[in-house]
Each structure stands twice: as structure tokens, then as C-alpha cells.
Amino acid sequence: DRSVSRGLGDVYKRQTVVISGSGNVAIYACEKATQLGAKVVTMSDSNGYVYDPNGIDLAYVKDLKEVRRGRIKEYAETHEGVTYVADCTKVWTVPCDIALPCATQNEINKESAEALVKNGCTVVCEGANMPSTPDAIEVYLANGVLYGPAKAANAGGVATSGLEMSQNSERLSWTFEEVDAKLK
């Protein structure tokens, strides 16, 4: 997030973000985007996605997915004004400024990338491992979409693994905030 922010200023502030997935990568991408001032409006699982125009209730999603091991559809059943769509591939048709694919490999194909561009997306930053097909990447580049490939976007995860090994070898326990500060 820091390298992107240096190039674009406050890239996340007041931006609408679409996220796929609801596992660790998606949850923490949602948390970071929200901390940086964005409004995350979607999360998904393999059965479908939820659209919350007021912004995702991350505390609920964390409880739903990490504690109760529920399905994302339950979010729509408990939150007023939320839409559930029983097709996770359609998450990329939701208008957004920033797309964070955090679910699975090859989840954004050419048609999905074209839908993102048509609906105003200007930034795609990959959280999942290779979520965009080569055809999708061509669409981003041809349309001036700022594209953060998984290799670059996940560098923080690799660095965090190194920090975790250091922490373990010294028998220390760092808070989330301490790890985040060390990454910066």
C-alpha cells in the first residue's frame, strides 16, 4: 500500500473498492483499505458475493468466516440493504475505483476486466496468486488501469514471513501494529 500511495498520494481515500474472497487475504485487504479511507463494498466466496453500498461490516465478516465458518450469503441475511448474488464471477461487474482480487487464480478473465474498465475501475492490485488471466492484463494495460501484479503486491507477505521467523527465533511476540510498522 505504501509504494502505491507514494506514487498516487492518498490513493484509497474516498474510493470505492471491490474485493473478491473472504479468507485471510481478502479480510486483511479489506481492513487495510478501510484504514486508508476506502469504502469496501463487496466480498465473496465460491458460491457468490455480497454488495453492501454502505461498506462491508468487517467485524461481522471476520466472525462469520474465522469463527463460525459460515457462507458469505449469511451477511446479506443479517444486514439491511445488502444484495447477494449467487455467482461469484459477477463481482467484477460492480462499479468501483479499485479492484482487489483476493480469491483464486484466473478469477478475472478478459470479459471481467472489460466490465471493470467500463464501470470506472482505475486500479487493480492482486492479492490472490495470479488472479488475472493474460487477456485481462492486456485489457488493463490497454485502458490505462494501474495494475499491481501479485508478485509485487504480495511482497509484504513475503517480508512478513521473514519477520515472523525472526520473531520466532527470538521467542518474541509482536502485535499487528508492530509488524505493520516494521514493514513500512
State where each predicted segment sits.
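Single conserved hydrophobic/aromatic residue that forms the stacking wall/gate
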Residues: 1-8, 12
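General beta-strand structural signal in soluble alpha/beta enzymes
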Residues: 19, 42-45, 84, 100-101, ...
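A structured beta-alpha segment of the ubiquitous adenosine-cofactor-binding alpha/beta core
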Residues: 62-112
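Adenosine-phosphate binding glycine-rich loop
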Residues: 117-184
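NAD(P)-binding Rossmann-fold cofactor-contacting core
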Residues: 36-76
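Hydrophobic Val/Ile/Leu positions in short beta-strands of Rossmann-like dinucleotide-binding domains
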Residues: 12, 17-19
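Glycine-rich Rossmann-fold phosphate-binding loop(s) that bind the pyrophosphate
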Residues: 22
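N-terminal Rossmann-fold NAD(P) dinucleotide-binding loop
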Residues: 26-27
